[in-house]
Amino acid sequence: MPYRMSRQAYAETYGPTVGDRIRLADTELFIQVEQDFTTYGDEVKFGGGKVIRDGMGQSPIANADGAVDLVITNALILDWWGIVKADIGIKDGKIFKIGKAGNPYIQDHVDIIIGPGTEALAGEGMILTAGGIDTHIHFICPQQIEVAIASGITTMIGGGTGPATGTNATTCTPGPWNMYRMLQAADAFPMNLGFLGKGNASQPQGLTEQIFAGAIGLKLHEDWGTTPATIDTCLSVADEYDVQVAIHTDTLNEAGFVEDTIAAFKNRAIHTYHTEGAGGGHAPDIIKVCGQANVLPSSTNPTRPYTVNTLDEHLDMLMVCHHLDPAIAEDVAFAESRIRRETIAAEDILHDLGAFSMIASDSQAMGRVGEVIIRTWQTSHKMKVQRGSLAGDGKADNLRAKRYVAKYTINPAITHGISQYVGSVEAGKLADLCLWRPGFFGVKPEIVIKGGMIAWSQMGDANASIPTPQPVHMRPMFGSFAGARNATSLTFVSQAALERDIPQQLGLRKSAVAVSGTRQLTKQEMKLNDALPHIEVDPETYEVRADGELLTCEPATVLPMAQRYFLF
């Protein structure tokens, strides 16, 4: 006889199912379940008197014969490709299957086998996303990594050597010796890491040696001199060795204007950092490049979203980050030229249109490493409130949610040639995953999984009789320590470095894998963020138009995902 449950009772027991809507934190964003891979009446759930017991939902099948190492039950997956309810099987540190878990001897349609060697993680009522990818890291201090993983970031790409003056301003790990030391340091962290070399050179040999040393890309930064000659040389070397180039262009227009920089690209793929320009770049019109097919544009989070406080905080940040002197008029003028309310407002809308493809932090160098995910969803919320639902979205905001989650997951992975390993919740990829309570979505993850093992988690008093007594906060778990962190995280290097056995020569303990497929990319590969509007910027008023339409919006006076969740 069938048993009927109300939707509320079902959701409280097994999590939401097809047609149910879920609010994301305290935003005005709602997502709706599109598909449910589980079977009504045959769901698996762990606990006393529940299903995952021997002879019931747990089979006698050994892991060697197909049972998974970890099953996440009844989770709601939010990814660029869909919003679905499913069980997730993890085996050998990778996502094995998204589907229906259980005991194939007594249950139908089981494609994730639970056995005596299977750990269980309750995903009922939880949202599951891929671990975030931050591709604009100034490696100024190692404590950034703790803050990042606690926020849901599992991959960090950028450059630096610590709190050196160059690193404070530019995301470069310059030269082989510095690159080797940073690769060795990477072994200490439960984080996938990749380092960019310095790309500013008008001759190739100094760039080539950095790629041979392990750089996964090169960074062109105006503080080192981003001229048309250095752009051309850097991209030519990148083309030869299949690594990405990231660029911070010439704010002062000393060596040319934005048109000269675009010409120097010669239609070659390039990742433009802080494409709006407050973080640096041709003033006032670097934002034009987001309409170029070969440009993969990102934002950094201090301008995300546009608020009443955005302009005021930027000037002081900029003076510190770029080693400027407030007593020198030219330095102040340089700083002020980068901060424009009109282009920052337009940036909000260009994200909502899918014309800006990625969001990153610019950590400790005008950006906040722990706020990439928060700022992304705050931008999405602001655009929902100010612009209404996207075409195709109705009572739920599925398209908008998928567009925005792609900005810090799959699109940065594609851009930097690592999407075969990370960036989405898909079978075969490293099991870098975040579980969120819906009320805390995007703000504070409940559990961060690295390579199939819990690395960080909300955890209460370790002396308590149960895990939940206060104070509860994010803490490192066993996946963050000793050999476990090396077995569950990756170090990204160039193919040229692998061919030269650099990881072995340095004694690296993490698996080192090569980036690939970076040089033939176009914006068309940016998932749900591939719009190519024609951008015009008025040089006097800084007004921005896309395909002739003025892009403007009001600054937010209040935001969700803010004081409600934090004491400080």
UniProtKB/Swiss-Prot annotation:
Residues forming the catalytic site: 322
Main location: cytoplasm
Location in the cell: Cytoplasm
E.C. code: 3.5.1.5
Signal peptide annotation: none
Alphabetized Gene3D superfamilies for the sequence: Metal-dependent hydrolases (3.20.20.140), Urease, subunit C, domain 1 (2.30.40.10)
Substrates-to-products reaction catalysed: urea + 2 H2O + H(+) = hydrogencarbonate + 2 NH4(+)
Pfam families: Amidohydro_1, Urease_alpha
Residues that, per the record, bind Ni(2+) 2: 219, 248, 274
Protein origin, superkingdom: Bacteria
Gene Ontology BP terms: urea catabolic process
UniProt entry keywords in alphabetical sequence: Cytoplasm, Hydrolase, Metal-binding, Nickel
Required cofactor(s): Ni cation
Co-factor: note: Binds 2 nickel ions per subunit.
Chain positions recorded as Ni(2+) 1 binding sites: 136, 138, 219, 362
Key word Hydrolase present: yes
Cellular component GO terms, alphabetical: cytoplasm
Chain ranges passing through the membrane: none
Pathway named in the protein's UniProt entry: Nitrogen metabolism; urea degradation; CO(2) and NH(3) from urea (urease route): step 1/1
Enzyme class: hydrolase
Domain Urease: 131-568
Ligand binding (substrate): 221
Homology family: Belongs to the metallo-dependent hydrolases superfamily. Urease alpha subunit family.
UniProt cross-references to PANTHER family, sorted A to Z: UREASE (PTHR43440:SF1)
NCBIfam families: PRK13206.1, PRK13207.1, urease_alph
The name this protein goes by in its record: Urease subunit alpha
